[in-house]
């Protein structure tokens, strides 16, 4: 599985960065915009799980969003592009979580960690 991921990832990065974003820098924003607006209009909290570029982070903040950066412990950025872009996002983040790497049999521990973090965020945002 890791071999396949390492082989395919450069193609996906090239498509997403060097083709898709060159055609429309806001392509990912435009893709989720209607869903986010629908959630907000219906008192739901939209969650965007992958923000890679400064214009995406700026759009979230312009729409009263909160940005949580989750950094997995002992895992470096996947490539130079990710490393470079993540530095640009630092000014937009509201929270940073250092996420431990859990084993396959550690779901309860993972859930406990997530609940604790979400509780902390609720206290700050309240």
Could you tell me what each predicted segment is?
Residues 26, 31, 54-126:
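Small-molecule kinase domains that catalyze NTP-dependent phosphoryl transfer to phosphate-bearing small molecules
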Residues 1-43:
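ATP-dependent small-molecule kinase phosphotransfer cores
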Residues 44-46, 66:
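Short active-site oxyanion
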Residues 46-47, 96:
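Receiver (REC) domain switch-region micro-motif
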Residues 49-51:
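Short His-Asn-centered micro-motif
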């Amino acid at each position: 599985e890791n071999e396949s991921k390492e082989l395919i990832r450069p193609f996906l990065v090239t498509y997403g960065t060097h083709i898709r974003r060159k055609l429309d820098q806001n392509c990912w924003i435009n893709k989720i915009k209607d869903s986010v607006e629908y959630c907000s209009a219906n008192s739901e909290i939209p969650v965007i799980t992958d923000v890679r570029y400064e214009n995406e982070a700026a759009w979230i903040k312009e729409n009263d969003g909160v940005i949580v950066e989750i950094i997995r412990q002992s895992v470096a950025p996947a490539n130079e592009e990710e490393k470079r872009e993540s530095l640009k996002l630092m000014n937009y983040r509201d929270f940073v979580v250092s996420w431990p790497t859990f084993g396959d049999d550690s779901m309860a521990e993972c859930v406990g960690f997530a609940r604790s973090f979400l509780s902390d965020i609720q206290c700050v945002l309240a």
